[in-house]
């Protein structure tokens, strides 16, 4: 009898050893499969959000190009200029034009720096109501005043004369709905629509009221400032991002377009490193850990908690001892507990999906559109298409760098510098070359 009992115990130990070994093999195989799924999800997530960002940028630029080619009001200057472009004297000297344009660009840059620093100071000392009031006034002017001017010029260009009451009613509803969607609550698509139209209107204002050469200098110096403000250790926009992450809060509305949701953060393409405010409960902490808030680019795709999944099919044979039965029961409980978080994790993943996305500042929308709109004002489609392609290539390259470095990066420099190079090369080299070749009947 003792020998029989020892044989049974030895057989039970061997069986348990084989079970644990088989479980480890299954677990390793499942972990490898999970890693492959995560990598595939990262690629799909990144590609989808790049497309979701290209579409609104293209729509904003298309609206500006369409307006520049159909409404003469925005393509003609009429001698009016912005207050912060004081050097507008007429001259034929290229050197004087260049110096005056550079002076105007530097004055405008000083205004941008001053407003940025003022915004940082308000945010640092938590003057949130003052900041929101400032942004609400800006949105109000864009949605009511500038939209009214735009609609008026559109009606003039297409020779349409509706009732004044009808126009006022429509513009009033449009403005009120926009204020609600941007600063309060509203459907996602409607929020995105209003942010795109606001960016296009602001770009049209810059194109109309900035002097001819000043536009190009402004684009250059603003791109350089974007580099300094984001990448330097004491840069204001970098400080803004870090402060917001420390406080674990969004900054302000009406500043950011997100490919996932309108979730205001910064004036640059940024990576969010904030942790999720929901803490795991004690029951969940045994099987999974709460994962941090996701980045706003494809390089930080959310990773589901790795849970060891063991098949629930556990056979308890009649000749096993009571201890073996007890161990099997414990194993079943652990398996069921490991399976439970998947439902909660799925809901949490859906919640995170609503708040993630590649975030691009409205300033980037505006200056992309300024570049393309100014290029289209000369009615040269070769130059316009070249600038459009350059902007998208630069934006795509910026997103690649964002995924590699996983930190806030400026979205203007690469796209704007590429657009400027493509513009001048196409306008001064390629277009004259193609024209001459066509005139010589060498190209059909």
UniProtKB/Swiss-Prot annotation:
<feature type="topological domain" description="Lumenal">
    <location>
        <begin position="152"/>
        <end position="163"/>
    </location>
</feature>
<dbReference type="InterPro" id="IPR001686">
    <property type="entry name" value="Pept_A22A_Ceel"/>
</dbReference>
<feature type="topological domain" description="Cytoplasmic">
    <location>
        <begin position="123"/>
        <end position="130"/>
    </location>
</feature>
<feature type="topological domain" description="Lumenal">
    <location>
        <begin position="381"/>
        <end position="384"/>
    </location>
</feature>
<feature type="topological domain" description="Cytoplasmic">
    <location>
        <begin position="406"/>
        <end position="413"/>
    </location>
</feature>
<feature type="active site">
    <location>
        <position position="226"/>
    </location>
</feature>
<dbReference type="GO" id="GO:0005789">
    <property type="term" value="C:endoplasmic reticulum membrane"/>
</dbReference>
<comment type="similarity">
    <text>Belongs to the peptidase A22A family.</text>
</comment>
<dbReference type="GO" id="GO:0042500">
    <property type="term" value="F:aspartic endopeptidase activity, intramembrane cleaving"/>
</dbReference>
<feature type="topological domain" description="Cytoplasmic">
    <location>
        <begin position="435"/>
        <end position="444"/>
    </location>
</feature>
<dbReference type="InterPro" id="IPR001108">
    <property type="entry name" value="Peptidase_A22A"/>
</dbReference>
<dbReference type="GO" id="GO:0110011">
    <property type="term" value="P:regulation of basement membrane organization"/>
</dbReference>
<keyword id="KW-0812">Transmembrane</keyword>
<keyword id="KW-0472">Membrane</keyword>
<feature type="transmembrane region" description="Helical">
    <location>
        <begin position="131"/>
        <end position="151"/>
    </location>
</feature>
<comment type="subunit">
    <text>Homodimer. Component of the gamma-secretase complex, a complex probably composed of the presenilin homodimer (sel-12, hop-1 or spe-4), nicastrin (aph-2), aph-1 and pen-2. Interacts with sel-10.</text>
</comment>
<dbReference type="GO" id="GO:0016048">
    <property type="term" value="P:detection of temperature stimulus"/>
</dbReference>
<keyword id="KW-1133">Transmembrane helix</keyword>
<comment type="function">
    <text>Probable catalytic subunit of the gamma-secretase complex, an endoprotease complex that catalyzes the intramembrane cleavage of integral membrane proteins such as Notch receptors (lin-12 or glp-1). Provides the major presenilin function compared to hop-1 and spe-4. Required cell-autonomously for correct neurite connectivity of the AIY cholinergic interneurons and their correct functioning in thermotaxis. Required for mesodermal patterning of muscle function. Promotes basement membrane gap formation during tissue remodeling.</text>
</comment>
<dbReference type="InterPro" id="IPR042524">
    <property type="entry name" value="Presenilin_C"/>
</dbReference>
<dbReference type="GO" id="GO:0006509">
    <property type="term" value="P:membrane protein ectodomain proteolysis"/>
</dbReference>
<feature type="transmembrane region" description="Helical">
    <location>
        <begin position="360"/>
        <end position="380"/>
    </location>
</feature>
<dbReference type="GO" id="GO:0004175">
    <property type="term" value="F:endopeptidase activity"/>
</dbReference>
<dbReference type="GO" id="GO:0070765">
    <property type="term" value="C:gamma-secretase complex"/>
</dbReference>
<dbReference type="GO" id="GO:0034205">
    <property type="term" value="P:amyloid-beta formation"/>
</dbReference>
<feature type="topological domain" description="Cytoplasmic">
    <location>
        <begin position="1"/>
        <end position="45"/>
    </location>
</feature>
<dbReference type="GO" id="GO:0017015">
    <property type="term" value="P:regulation of transforming growth factor beta receptor signaling pathway"/>
</dbReference>
<protein>
    <recommendedName>
        <fullName>Presenilin sel-12</fullName>
    </recommendedName>
</protein>
<dbReference type="InterPro" id="IPR006639">
    <property type="entry name" value="Preselin/SPP"/>
</dbReference>
<feature type="topological domain" description="Cytoplasmic">
    <location>
        <begin position="234"/>
        <end position="359"/>
    </location>
</feature>
<feature type="transmembrane region" description="Helical">
    <location>
        <begin position="46"/>
        <end position="66"/>
    </location>
</feature>
<feature type="transmembrane region" description="Helical">
    <location>
        <begin position="385"/>
        <end position="405"/>
    </location>
</feature>
<keyword id="KW-0914">Notch signaling pathway</keyword>
<feature type="transmembrane region" description="Helical">
    <location>
        <begin position="102"/>
        <end position="122"/>
    </location>
</feature>
<feature type="region of interest" description="Disordered">
    <location>
        <begin position="275"/>
        <end position="331"/>
    </location>
</feature>
<dbReference type="GO" id="GO:0007399">
    <property type="term" value="P:nervous system development"/>
</dbReference>
<feature type="topological domain" description="Lumenal">
    <location>
        <begin position="67"/>
        <end position="101"/>
    </location>
</feature>
<feature type="topological domain" description="Cytoplasmic">
    <location>
        <begin position="185"/>
        <end position="189"/>
    </location>
</feature>
<dbReference type="Pfam" id="PF01080">
    <property type="entry name" value="Presenilin"/>
</dbReference>
<dbReference type="GO" id="GO:0045176">
    <property type="term" value="P:apical protein localization"/>
</dbReference>
<dbReference type="GO" id="GO:0045747">
    <property type="term" value="P:positive regulation of Notch signaling pathway"/>
</dbReference>
<feature type="transmembrane region" description="Helical">
    <location>
        <begin position="213"/>
        <end position="233"/>
    </location>
</feature>
């Amino acid at each position: 009898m003792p020998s029989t009992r020892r044989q049974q115990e030895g057989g039970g130990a061997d069986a348990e050893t084989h079970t644990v070994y088989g479980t480890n093999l299954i677990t390793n195989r499942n972990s490898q499969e999970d890693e492959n799924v995560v990598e595939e999800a990262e690629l799909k997530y990144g590609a989808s959000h790049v497309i979701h960002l290209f579409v609104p940028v293209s729509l904003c630029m298309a609206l500006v190009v369409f307006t520049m080619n159909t409404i003469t009001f925005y393509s003609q200057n009429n001698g009016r200029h912005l207050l912060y472009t004081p050097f507008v004297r007429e001259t034929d000297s290229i050197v004087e034009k260049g110096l005056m344009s550079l002076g105007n660009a530097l004055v405008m840059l000083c205004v941008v720096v001053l407003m940025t620093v003022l915004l940082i100071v308000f945010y640092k000392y938590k003057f949130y109501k003052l900041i929101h009031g400032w942004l609400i006034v800006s949105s109000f002017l864009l949605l009511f005043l500038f939209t009214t001017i735009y609609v008026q010029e559109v009606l003039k260009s297409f020779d349409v004369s509706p009732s004044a009451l009808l126009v006022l009613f429509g513009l009033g509803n449009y403005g009120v709905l926009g204020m609600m969607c941007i600063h309060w609550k509203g459907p996602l698509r409607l929020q995105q629509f209003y942010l795109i139209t606001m960016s296009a209107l602001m770009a049209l204002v810059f194109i109309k009221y900035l002097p001819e050469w000043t536009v190009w200098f402004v684009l250059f110096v603003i791109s350089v400032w974007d580099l300094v403000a984001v990448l330097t250790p004491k840069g204001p926009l970098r400080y803004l991002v870090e402060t917001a992450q420390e406080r674990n809060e969004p900054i302000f509305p009406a500043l950011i377009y997100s490919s996932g949701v309108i979730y205001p953060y910064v004036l640059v393409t940024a990576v969010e490193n904030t942790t999720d405010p929901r803490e795991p409960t004690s029951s969940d902490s045994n099987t999974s850990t709460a994962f941090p808030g996701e980045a706003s680019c494809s390089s930080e795709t959310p990773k589901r908690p790795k849970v060891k999944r063991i098949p629930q099919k556990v056979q308890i044979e009649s000749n096993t001892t009571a201890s073996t039965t007890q161990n099997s029961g414990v194993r079943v409980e652990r398996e069921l507990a490991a399976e439970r978080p998947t439902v909660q994790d799925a809901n949490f993943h859906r919640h995170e999906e609503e708040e993630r996305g590649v975030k691009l500042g409205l300033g980037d929308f505006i200056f992309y559109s300024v570049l393309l709109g100014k290029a289209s004002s000369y009615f040269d489609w070769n130059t316009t298409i070249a600038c459009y392609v350059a902007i998208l290539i630069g934006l795509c390259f910026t997103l690649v760098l964002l995924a590699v470095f996983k930190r806030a990066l400026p979205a203007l420099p690469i796209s704007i510098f590429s657009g400027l190079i493509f513009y001048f090369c196409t306008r001064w080299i390629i277009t004259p070359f193609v024209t001459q070749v066509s005139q010589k009947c060498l190209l059909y």
